[in-house]
Swiss-Prot record:
Keywords attached to this entry: Cytoplasm, DNA-binding
Region described as Disordered: 1-26
Annotated function: Binds to DNA and alters its conformation. May be involved in regulation of gene expression, nucleoid organization and DNA protection.
Lineage of producing organism: Bacteria, Bacillati, Bacillota, Bacilli, Bacillales
GO MF: DNA binding
Similarity comment: family membership: Belongs to the YbaB/EbfC family.
Name of the protein in question: Nucleoid-associated protein ABC0038
Oligomeric and partner information: Homodimer.
Places the protein is found: Cytoplasm, Nucleoid
Entries under HAMAP family matching the protein: DNA_YbaB_EbfC
Principal location class: cytoplasm
Gene Ontology cellular component annotations, sorted alphabetically: bacterial nucleoid; cytosol
Chain intervals with Low complexity compositional bias: 1-22
Length: 105
């Protein structure tokens, strides 16, 4: 490979890296929402996998059935994190297509 081609390739990689870093920063500002149990529990998460809110309907708060509430919170949280993964793939997938880097995103 010629030095000129190698230099161009390095410039392209640096440009792509900057674009990817910008996209990662933008992900922090995006949110996803997951609702389970017919609206009983809603979890809102950021694009960098931080749980921002957990909203629980008063109807589901039953001191005699705490386990159901726990299950709904877990289900909503897992669904929100799944949606974040989909958002990350949508926003950053264009940078990793064709690269074989398992577990990177």
């Amino acid at each position: 490979m010629e030095m000129k081609n190698m230099g161009n390739m390095m410039k392209q990689m640096q440009k792509m890296q900057k674009q990817m870093m910008k996209a990662q920063e933008e992900l922090k500002e995006k949110t996803v929402e997951a609702t389970v149990g017919g609206g009983m529990v809603t979890v809102i998460a950021s694009g960098d996998k931080r749980i921002l809110e957990v909203n629980i309907s008063e109807d589901v708060v039953d001191p005699d059935d705490v386990e159901m509430l726990q299950d709904l919170i877990i289900a909503a949280t897992n669904e929100a994190l799944k949606k974040v993964d989909e958002l990350v793939e949508q926003d950053l997938g264009k940078f990793t297509k064709g690269l074989n880097m398992p577990g990177m995103f």
